[in-house]
UniProtKB/Swiss-Prot annotation:
Catalytically driven reaction(s): [protein]-L-isoaspartate + S-adenosyl-L-methionine = [protein]-L-isoaspartate alpha-methyl ester + S-adenosyl-L-homocysteine
Subcellular location per the Swiss-Prot or TrEMBL entry: Cytoplasm
Gene name linked to the record: pcm2
Gene Ontology MF term list: protein-L-isoaspartate (D-aspartate) O-methyltransferase activity
PROSITE patterns named among the record's database cross-references: PCMT (PS01279)
Domain of life, per lineage: Bacteria
Gene Ontology cellular component annotations, sorted alphabetically: cytoplasm
Protein name: Protein-L-isoaspartate O-methyltransferase 2
UniProt enzyme class: transferase
KW Methyltransferase (keyword) present: yes
Record GO biological process: methylation; protein modification process; protein repair
Length: 247
């Protein structure tokens, strides 16, 4: 898709969202806030275009970011801030990621309707919901049992039947359902976990923040070619909660 056609799509998307907010505010009180969030994501994409390698994210990603109800994935006390372009606390020392980062990570995976994706770090379930709009199946692992249970119930209530959540140490992946077309890790690891590399399908992509909690973390893109060789590329400096577990 050309840059011109991408821009036209986004203009239409934002205008339709604004109209929906004006006409159906009673039905969707968050419509205007979601439209503002989408604009801010686009602004961040332009600002970081040299790092992410593009001036605009996939229009499919933006359409889904505009549609998935982020307010359903944050605690009641944080709902007034649900569509601000920043992370929010969800309890147990964890956060729901900044919408811009969620959009970039989803875009970089380059997954499709037949893809199977592994998510390490379910958290609130928001990233899993975004992915579920694109792919056939999402397998999500959360080490904190209470978060895993709440996220699973929430995703089921919202109709995301193609997401499966379990409690466990995501460092080791989910071997029973490997290999995966894409892997997204939503907590920072000190290194790229070898089990996740093993479970990435040839031709697949993994997006993972790497670095310690007291050092600069880098969002890394890992690509595995058809011969099983991997290459990595730094995308952005980021700040994620640490990946926990027995590794």
């Amino acid at each position: 898709m050309s840059r011109k056609s991408t821009g036209a799509f986004l203009v239409i998307l934002l205008l339709s969202m604004a109209a929906g907010g004006a006409v159906g505010a009673a039905d969707d009180p968050y419509g205007a806030a979601r439209a503002k969030m989408v604009r801010e994501i686009e602004e961040d994409a332009r600002r970081t275009s040299e790092r992410i390698g593009k001036t605009a994210l996939d229009p499919r990603v933006m359409e889904i970011m505009a549609r998935v109800p982020r307010h359903e994935f944050v605690p009641a006390a944080e709902r007034a801030y649900a569509y601000e372009n920043r992370p929010l606390p969800i309890g147990y020392g964890q956060t729901i990621s900044q919408p811009y980062i969620v959009a970039v990570m989803t875009d970089l995976l380059k997954v499709g309707s037949e893809s199977t994706v592994l998510e390490v770090g379910t958290g609130s379930g928001y990233q899993a919901a975004i992915l579920a709009e694109f792919v056939r199946s999402v397998y999500s692992i959360e080490i904190i049992e209470a978060l895993a249970e709440t996220a699973a119930e929430r995703l089921k209530r919202l109709g995301y039947d193609n997401v499966r959540v379990r409690t466990g140490d995501g460092y080791h992946g989910w071997k029973e359902h490997a290999p995966f077309d894409g892997i997204v890790v939503t907590a920072a690891a000190g290194h790229i976990p070898p089990p996740l590399l093993d479970q990435l399908k040839p031709g697949g992509r993994m997006i993972i923040p790497v670095g310690g909690p007291f050092f600069v973390q880098q969002l890394m893109l890992v690509e595995k070619d058809e011969q099983g060789r991997t290459r990595t590329r730094q995308i952005l400096p980021v700040a994620f909660v640490p990946l926990t577990g027995g590794h």
